[in-house]
């Protein structure tokens, strides 16, 4: 992607990141951990890639930034694949179309998102036998 494409993509996506205007002229080292996480996500989204992988997206984010992140991921998912690794079942239930569970490094269950209560039941069934992950 050239510079002009990057600028167009940033302009198109910045409305999904309310903090953009407040941090755009700051040195990265002065930003909070949560702000850095959101800027990293914005960078991935504006890259134009058809697949984005996000690991533990909510780690270190306050409630407000979690909402911003959820909205941004849902909007970014249109027309692309977004793979989110998460242990936060509430967050997963808010953003996922499909959930994949792993145990001992292997995929054990794939299901459509049927809401947080059903996700919690599946999680308990998979992991309670051995006392956790």
Range-by-range predicted roles:
Residues 62:
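ABC-family nucleotide-binding domains
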Residues 106-128:
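Conserved beta-strand-loop-alpha-helix hinge in the C-terminal portion
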Residues 27-31:
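Conserved ABC ATPase signature
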Residues 52-55:
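Catalytic Walker B motif of ABC-type/P-loop ATPase nucleotide-binding domains
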Residues 41:
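Hydrophobic anchor residue at the start of the ABC signature
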Residues 88-94:
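Conserved H-loop
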Residues 67-78:
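Helical segment within the ABC ATPase nucleotide-binding domain
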